[in-house]
Amino acid sequence: MFTHYSLDTLLGHSLTAIGRAADLVWWIFDVDGAEYSLHTQCTFRVLHDGEAVLSRSDIYCIRDDKPLGRDNSWFDYDVAELAPLLPAKVVSIECSEMNDLTICTENGLRIEKEPQ
């Protein structure tokens, strides 16, 4: 059993999925055949090659072209658009004393999490 967890465990391993349950966003990583999940309920954004492609605020933006219900936010749409970029190998992780977190992948994805 683990007595502590380290984000460095994710280095060299792949981000395989992104999803949500209500406003909790989950990031799934494959670490030697085991799934590790990072859960966030704070401000974040995802950039691809420097362009913002996903953010927490997208959860609350409903698409007008879809009926109300499940998977009708811009977040859900944008996650589906990101799917072809996954899996993405993690090449760097930075965490500040203020709990800012940045995860970068080899294909240009950059996840930036900010504390609230």
Model regions: which residues?
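Surface-exposed, interaction-prone regions used to assemble/regulate multi-protein complexes
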Residues: 1-116
